[in-house]
Amino acid sequence: MRVVLIGRLLIGVLALRELLAQGEDVVGVVVSSLDPYPGLPSEESVRKLANRERLPVLQIPLNKVNEPDVLQAIRKLKPDLIMSPFPSVPFCQELLRIPSIGCINFHPSKLPEAKGFTTSLYHMYRGDDQNWITLHWLDEGVDTGPILSQGAAGIDREDTGFTIRRKTFEVARGLLRDALPLLRQGKAPRIEQLPVPEGRPYSFNWQPSFAEIDWTASSQQVVRRVRTLSHPKDFAFETSAAYTTFLSRRLFVWDAREDDRDARMIAGCEPGQVLAATGDGIGIRTGDGSIVATDITLDEDQDGDSLGALDLLGMRVPTVLG
């Protein structure tokens, strides 16, 4: 098949690698004008991979993919298939009609639930035990096209948003691997989306405020939020680490665990109250118990050593955070 990839970030790199591994004729690669992205390793650059493979590259702001000059450039490539992992905008009808087979996309949720452009952390944030990804056909809507296939990575206790992201992208690569022969043969499924299951959202749009810790939540929920938003401090992740406020400044919590502190020791303490320093961190009261924050930094010291913040908190027991 003649394939045009419109892609970005690690998911775009993995999709391009799989297309090449399967011997597809990648006739063009459309990448972001920001690629390679500041703060991301070279392994997440679609442009660098395309250049190494000597593929034709068109570098544009990806939200301009529907512009007439871009459409003309893609049309000249005469693609059978457009593969677009995580598009930045819905495709216009003119773009959708260019490839003879169609346009396909990865969406990081178990469609039909959680449509939208910022859903990568949706399943882990909700507390699900699996992080789903859907390969689907594109139409003019936002994640409303027929489903081709779905898969999931199990969320382990030690997973963070950073690690589950990578695990899920590998699942996505496997979905593409299985789909390519079906696409060549004209046998790829087009499963119409069912109504959204009761209790699950139609769409999910990440808000920066979601990163703020609610200390009235359970210890399990607080730790889950911390782990969902945890990532290497030098990595340009899609959101900040989980945070609370301390002395009118943001205090980022990068790692935490549930505490087995005796309930009698925290009786009378309010949620968010700093309890005491432990061997590996700071105990903090939650809605139903306590957690130990084991890696924290103050706002201006995100890239620095966490010990300064831990020591500062330890000297201010019983400070109330938030």
Q: Language-model segments: what does each one mean?
A:
Residues 237-255:
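Short, structured protein-protein interaction patches enriched in aromatics and acidic/basic residues
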Residues 232-239, 263-269:
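Low-complexity, polar-biased intrinsically disordered regions enriched in Pro/Ser/Thr/Gly
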Residues 1-237, 249, 278-292, 297-322:
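One-carbon transfer enzymes
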Residues 254-261, 295-301:
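A short, sequence-level motif marking secondary-structure junctions
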Residues 261-281:
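A conserved acidic, glycine/proline-rich C-terminal tail/linker
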